[in-house]
């Protein structure tokens, strides 16, 4: 059984889960999480915020941060050799970002857990510049997760199946595209961005990005990005987010090399961890490349 580090899993403290519409059941069972980790050879897991509606019922993002970040830090301290904590920010109060970032450091949280968008505001918005400056300065990775609250296209689809299946992956691709077009990646070259779900539809439109950019650039219809879009994508990291599709993995490898793909279970949304592991085990990759995806890439991001 390979050594595995899980870069994408979830735990919602009961104090938060009780204020959500969806996450009340199965999202607060840390013992179940540990059992599945042991059964599947997962040494450590990163705990990320799944995005929820808790901030609405709890009276705002700051109150959510007060509870969530503290409770995640307690789990990390209790199981310090098994879990790595990701902290969240009061996105509706950017004036509090600096204070909350310092609090995250003081609590021992090692990763910034952000969403692709917040009520239509993407991470290319200037309010996030101080966050990325902090991440670049401290080396804290930024994990970017799907947004369940009003993702792209929500006003058109409004469907309990189509929203998580289609809108989530379109939202991440829109986020990456907007960050590229706004110059966010150029402005913050030292930030280690990790995007969930292979970057959404990005692997499928990589060639279209380059070809269309080159065509439009010749006619001066698009600004000079200094390099093809695919060159930006090579510097990003993508986690597999519980995917059991070998085709998706191979498609992602056309965008980035194995050194930029991370194992991620997306537990408890996905509980068949063995099937996820089998996809990487069965891929036409070298033993070293498989080990990189399973375990060796992530410690380099965190200096573990």
What are these regions (language model features)?
Residues 2-44, 74, 99-103, 191-192, ...:
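Mid-to-C-terminal alpha-helical segments outside catalytic/metal-binding sites
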Residues 5-9, 45-47, 84-87, 112-114, ...:
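Hydrophobic faces of well-ordered beta-strands that scaffold small-molecule active sites
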Residues 10, 117, 147-148, 199, ...:
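Catalytic metal-binding/acid-base residues of hydrolase active sites
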Residues 10-28, 150-172, 211-235:
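Active-site gating loops and adjacent loop-to-helix segments of metal-dependent hydrolytic enzymes
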Residues 37-43, 74-83, 183-191, 231-236, ...:
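A structural motif corresponding to the C-terminal end of an alpha-helix
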Residues 43, 49-176:
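Active-site gating/metal-coordination segments in enzymes
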Residues 169-171, 188-190, 221-272:
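Active-site-adjacent C-terminal substructures of enzyme catalytic domains
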Residues 183, 189-231:
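Aromatic-lined glycan-binding groove of carbohydrate-active enzymes
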């Amino acid at each position: 059984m390979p050594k595995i580090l899980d870069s994408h899993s979830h735990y919602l403290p009961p104090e938060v889960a009780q204020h959500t519409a969806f996450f009340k059941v199965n999202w607060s069972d840390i013992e179940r999480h540990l059992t599945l980790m042991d059964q599947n050879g997962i040494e450590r897991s990163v705990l990320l915020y799944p995005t929820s509606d808790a901030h609405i019922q709890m009276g705002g993002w700051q109150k959510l941060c007060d509870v969530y970040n503290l409770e995640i830090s307690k789990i990390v301290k209790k199981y310090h050799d098994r879990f790595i904590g990701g902290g969240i920010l009061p996105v509706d109060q950017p004036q509090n970002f600096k204070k909350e970032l310092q609090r995250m450091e003081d609590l021992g949280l090692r990763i910034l857990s952000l969403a692709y968008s917040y009520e239509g505001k993407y991470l290319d918005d200037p309010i996030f510049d101080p966050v990325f400056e902090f991440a670049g300065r401290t080396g804290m990775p930024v994990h970017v997760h799907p947004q369940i609250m009003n993702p792209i296209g929500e006003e058109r689809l409004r469907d309990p199946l189509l929203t998580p299946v289609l809108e989530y992956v379109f939202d991440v691709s829109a986020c990456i595209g907007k960050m590229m077009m706004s110059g966010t990646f150029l402005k913050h070259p030292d930030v280690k961005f990790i995007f969930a779900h292979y970057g959404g539809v990005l692997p499928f439109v990589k060639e279209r990005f380059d070809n269309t950019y080159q065509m439009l650039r010749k006619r001066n219809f698009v600004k000079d990005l200094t390099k093809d879009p695919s060159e930006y994508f090579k510097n990003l990291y993508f986690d597999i987010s519980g995917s059991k599709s070998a085709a998706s993995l191979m498609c992602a490898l056309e965008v980035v090399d194995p050194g930029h793909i991370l194992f991620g279970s997306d537990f408890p949304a996905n509980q068949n961890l063995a099937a996820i592991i089998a996809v990487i085990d069965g891929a036409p990759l070298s033993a070293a490349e498989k080990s990189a995806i399973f375990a060796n890439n992530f410690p380099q991001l965190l200096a573990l």
